[in-house]
Amino acid sequence: MKIVGRRQSHLFAAVIKTALAIIISLVILALQIAFYAVLLLGIYNLWFLRIFTEVLGILVVLGLYRRDINSSYKLSWTIFILALPFAGVVFYFTFGGGRNVPKRKAEKINGYLKTKAVSGEEHKGLYSADPRGAMLVNSVRNNSFYDVYRHTNTEFFPDVAEKHRRMLKDIEDAKEYVYLEYFIISDGKVLDSVIDVLERKGKEGVKIKFIYDDIGSKKCLKRKTKKRIAAIENLELCVYEPMSLVINPRINYRDHRKITVVDGKVGYTGGDNLADEYTGEKIRFGHWRDNAVRITGDAVYALELMFSEIWFMSTGETLKLRDFVSDASASGFGYVLPFGDGPTNPLNPAYHLFESLTVAAEKYLYISTPYLIIDNSFINMIQLAAKSGVDVRILVPHIPDKKLIFAMTRGHYGDILKAGGKIYEYTPGFNHAKNIIVDDKYAFIGTVNCDYRSMLLHFECGTLIMHDPSVDKMRDDFLSAVAQSEEITLEKWENRPFLTKLSELLLAVIAPLL
């Protein structure tokens, strides 16, 4: 096993970057020490310090409003900085980057994607056959390096345990390589079963590349498990943005993707990680509802491209992707568009797709999400759909994994309920599935939550599926979950306790910052 780092040719640049990061960290640390000194020693009463911090806060806010980022995100930071200038400025420079990845880094990554991307002609047939479908495709392809594919099969898994069994079999059948990229890998039966099959395939000479997010896996991965992974033959491991003593603003930019690719022929993505709660092996927050999709055919190339993006960004190594050749003989029913999103792309394709799906709905709009913390623009789109007679239903958890975030989610019910939309809380437990289904024609499945963190900060992935049998299966799965859920009526929502209303109001101000 090789733990991948920068290549030798990049060593000098890496040393310089590390030195600069340490210097910046020391400056930020000095600001933080000064901040605590202000609190503990009460020297904020000094008039010149107050004037300095308030002027600094105003200058930071002016700079903030020059940035091309979400308006709600700007407003929350503005309130924080102007209310608490010293603390606000320190936290803003530490964590307030939004999609503000260094320009050179973003250009380098986007340049890499541009050289590897495939731009096909499949979308052109949609303009006459399905103009709304063409609009959805364009909302992604015009804002990213990903395009729509045909000659692709999808298989939807409403049961993640079944998906996991199928994925293990596909890995067992691997002949050349296996790529895995997950936000969370956690000690337990699920991860053990993956390691077991990787050990066998590594000994057979199959090349394995494995990415996992350090923060996502920090609390749930034992040292002995890491050592076991390290012992796998022919495996290269990349721990995405590992935590360190150096203060790193990129700590916000987590790799939230979930991808498996086998030999460039089979791919998986969805909401599930390599952890026992997703398959029901361990009970957390009641029944854990999630789903995933298996992709075969042309569109697997897009999943491979997403994986190679994070690998390139983290290691500096350019993966030798297979030359894309469309298999016209492959079966396939509809159109499939897997795509990646993240802070290196200021065009935000996931957000644009979500809004476009909302606009495209004529009969129904079904949304499944673990969190509902969205900006006014998206809320207005949902309201417009509901007021236009579209059957709008949104499924969220009843048993939360994060109580504070759940309170923010409930605070967003009112605007949608008043417009005629319906909200359901999944009574059996925690709804972690991220889906949008529209009119028996279009569906989204992936890792993107309806919250600021997913849409502004994380590296995410998703798949738009159109005119494919999986759309009907996703609809049926959604309605089955709704049948087990409690509908939250407007009357019930308005009758919640006063303190709950007050806390939701206060939380709404800081929601974009969380």
Q: Where are the regions a protein language model picked out?
A:
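N-terminal localization/anchoring segments of enzymes in phospholipid and broader phosphate metabolism
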Residues: M1-H352, S356, A360, P400, ...
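Helical hairpin unit composed of two closely spaced alpha helices linked by a short loop
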Residues: Y371-V392, P397, K402
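Histidine/acidic-residue-rich catalytic or RNA/ligand-binding cores of hydrolases
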Residues: S377-I379, F406-M408, V438
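Conserved acidic, small-residue-rich alpha-beta core segments centered on
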Residues: M408, I445-G446
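Active-site donor-binding acidic/aromatic loop of nucleotide-activated sugar
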Residues: I423-T427
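Catalytic-core elements of nucleic-acid end-processing and repair enzymes
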Residues: K434
